[in-house]
Amino acid sequence: MISAVYAQSEAEGILNRHRRIFSAFKNYVILSSTGGTAEPSPPSAAKREFMEHRNWNKNNIRTSLLGYGCMRFPTKADGTIDEARAEALLNTAKAAGVNYFDTAYPYHNGQSEPFVGRVIAKWDRSSFYLATKMPLWNCKSLDDAKRIFEEQLQRLGVDYIDFYLLHSLHKARYEKAKAMGLVDWLWQ
């Protein structure tokens, strides 16, 4: 019974911390993908203290608890990314202390990575962590995977990717990735 009470108390504490972070974040960012304008302004220094970060034990990495997913940016009527609004959202998130940005090869019909690359080119590369994903369904061989990886570096305009994930991974795809040598190549 005591451990159940402790676990509930611990869970409530975690939820309250996340509510505080989100509350501080939502006060100055408008997250809208349809209609209206999104003109978020950077937070004051006082608001930045609300973003919590965690250190990764075995690496010199410190990521924000809140990451920014780049799958659903605001779009224009023709379906393309509304770059002014989306850039304002990314800049606001970064100013609020978010330092983990996640995109992928197929997001926004292949336009998320190039757009994110144009935005992050204006930032100090050491101020954020970038994640993207290998589209395993496009890989028939290790050479395909290497070509796609190099293409992603170019699309993002970076020399390295901090977190490289395998997209839509399930057991069969993982086994295929292992068989083609992709898993071993990624661990090098």
PLM features: residue spans?
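Residue-identity detector for glycine
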Residues: 13, 35-36
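Short, positively charged and aromatic/hydrophobic N-terminal segments
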Residues: 28-30, 37, 41, 47
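Short hydrophobic alpha-helical segments enriched in small aliphatic residues
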Residues: 4-7, 19, 24, 29
